[in-house]
């Protein structure tokens, strides 16, 4: 198939039908009506806004999650915004059908209406970037900017989103670190089409900075501060937010996810296929992968605290890195790690280490040498210095249990206790983690060849 045929076939699968558009339109109208009624009943000074892909008409067929933001006046205190926002969310959630409380920067309500998820999020009714108080406030400005600038390129955005999903590079959440929907929209608006964005994959990386609203001219000092910060943190791409010069829209984008986009873009342009958009599921056996690699898999399973992914998973990542570092200090080579809400994977070169630990000591004719001699059971001389040895645990599970028991590892503050109380598995994972284990061991997560 040539590239035009591939794109035509993909568009048939990702562009909402007229019936679907009517369903979404009716759904949003009903939710808006119920929201306005609830605001009036509670006598609140607030205004509802739809944000996200549904509001911008860049959603993919079948993807109907609703983002409903309740905007309060700027003179509302943060405490009052949280309190009234949550109160409204609960009443509206009850009216829509069912709901639960979720937690991010502040609590919000996640409801369900006609089988569709509806996030009800309180925010400030900002008019420009100088009014922004909380992380979610910009969302209303983002929606306005995209609607003003997209100019009929909605399907180009859909193509880019589906491509990014297909190559496993979509989602700006901290545990994914890929392209956000808003970033995809900006790139289409900036470069004009899906194919142009792919063709610019190398150019973007070298140019590094994209500034759609010329903030460098309008607010040069603030924008340069943003650029210096992001360059200092070695970000692969800097996209100055069209609505706020203080923010890099690509701040969460990792080098690994951009690398997937970089290689897959070139591959698609060379050999176009619908496979990039709708890949076949990678099926494999983690035990076979272990046998072929001649390595070992250590799995820590635990019961996580009730936190949203954006808060929990960075803590799990920090813990995984801390345990990896400690195991390496204990003499084990850790070839890689991965993690999720309830697990940490560590691939190691061996399960046992040497049974003794040799410690180099001070000069034998010093006071330190005398204390070293008295403190240790087995001591010998190497030149002018003393050395000693002591027996140590050899099996990695014993070593790991000691590390956990003594708390000798860096960990997220909310998760350390859960890790310590969890289980340690060797070369085996529960059935529900077998796919994750295979993707980890096969390196499929970031594999480009």
Curated annotation (Swiss-Prot):
Binding site for CTP: 53, 56, 142, 161, 170
Cofactors: Mg(2+)
Binding site for Mg(2+): 65, 67, 119
Molecular function terms, GO-annotated: ATP binding; CCA tRNA nucleotidyltransferase activity; magnesium ion binding; tRNA binding
Keyword tRNA processing tagged: yes
Pfam family, one: tRNA_NucTransf2
Function, as annotated: Catalyzes the addition and repair of the essential 3'-terminal CCA sequence in tRNAs without using a nucleic acid template. Adds these three nucleotides in the order of C, C, and A to the tRNA nucleotide-73, using CTP and ATP as substrates and producing inorganic pyrophosphate. tRNA 3'-terminal CCA addition is required both for tRNA processing and repair. Also involved in tRNA surveillance by mediating tandem CCA addition to generate a CCACCA at the 3' terminus of unstable tRNAs. While stable tRNAs receive only 3'-terminal CCA, unstable tRNAs are marked with CCACCA and rapidly degraded.
Subunit details: Homodimer.
Protein name: CCA-adding enzyme
Organism: Pyrococcus horikoshii (strain ATCC 700860 / DSM 12428 / JCM 9974 / NBRC 100139 / OT-3)
Taxonomic classification: Archaea, Methanobacteriati, Methanobacteriota, Thermococci, Thermococcales
């Amino acid at each position: 198939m040539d590239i035009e045929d591939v794109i035509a076939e993909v568009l048939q699968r990702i562009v909402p039908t007229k019936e679907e558009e009517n369903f979404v339109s009716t759904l949003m109208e009903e939710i808006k009506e119920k929201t306005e009624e609830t605001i009036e009943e509670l006598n609140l000074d607030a205004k509802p806004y739809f944000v996200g892909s549904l509001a911008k008409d860049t959603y993919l067929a079948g993807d109907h999650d609703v983002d409903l933001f309740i905007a309060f006046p700027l003179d509302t205190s943060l405490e009052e915004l949280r309190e009234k926002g949550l109160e409204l969310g609960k009443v509206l959630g009850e009216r829509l059908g069912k709901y639960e409380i979720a937690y991010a920067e502040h609590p919000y309500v996640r409801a369900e209406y006609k089988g569709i998820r509806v996030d009800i999020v309180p925010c400030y009714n900002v008019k420009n970037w100088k009014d922004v108080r909380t992380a979610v406030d910009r969302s209303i400005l983002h929606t306005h900017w995209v609607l003003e600038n997209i100019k009929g390129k909605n399907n180009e955005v859909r193509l880019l989103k589906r491509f990014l999903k297909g190559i496993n590079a979509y989602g700006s959440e901290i545990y994914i670190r890929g392209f956000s929907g808003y970033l995809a929209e900006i790139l289409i608006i900036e470069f004009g089409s899906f194919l142009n964005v792919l063709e610019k994959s190398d150019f973007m990386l070298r140019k590094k900075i994209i500034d759609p609203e010329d903030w460098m001219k309008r607010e040069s000092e603030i924008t340069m501060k943003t650029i210096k910060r992001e360059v200092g943190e070695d970000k692969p791409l800097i996209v100055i937010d069209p609505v706020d010069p203080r923010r890099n829209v690509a701040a969460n984008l990792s080098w690994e996810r951009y690398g997937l986009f970089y290689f897959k873009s070139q591959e698609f342009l060379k050999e176009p296929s619908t496979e990039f958009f709708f890949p076949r599921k990678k099926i494999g056996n983690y035990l076979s992968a272990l046998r072929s690699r001649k390595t070992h898999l250590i799995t820590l399973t635990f019961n996580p605290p009730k936190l949203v992914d954006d808060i929990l998973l960075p803590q799990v990542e920090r813990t995984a890195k801390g345990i990896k570092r400690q195991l390496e200090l204990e003499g084990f080579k850790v070839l890689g790690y991965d993690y999720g809400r309830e697990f940490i994977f560590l691939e190691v070169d061996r399960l046992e280490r040497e049974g003794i630990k040799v410690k180099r000591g001070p000069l034998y004719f010093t006071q330190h040498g005398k204390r070293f001699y008295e403190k240790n059971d087995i001591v010998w001389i190497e030149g002018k210095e003393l050395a000693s040895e002591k027996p140590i645990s050899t099996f990695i599970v014993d070593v790991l249990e000691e590390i956990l028991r003594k708390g000798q590892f860096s960990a997220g503050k909310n998760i350390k206790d859960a890790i310590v109380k969890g289980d340690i598995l060797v070369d085996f994972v529960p059935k529900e983690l077998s796919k994750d284990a295979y993707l980890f061991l096969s390196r499929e997560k970031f594999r480009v060849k």
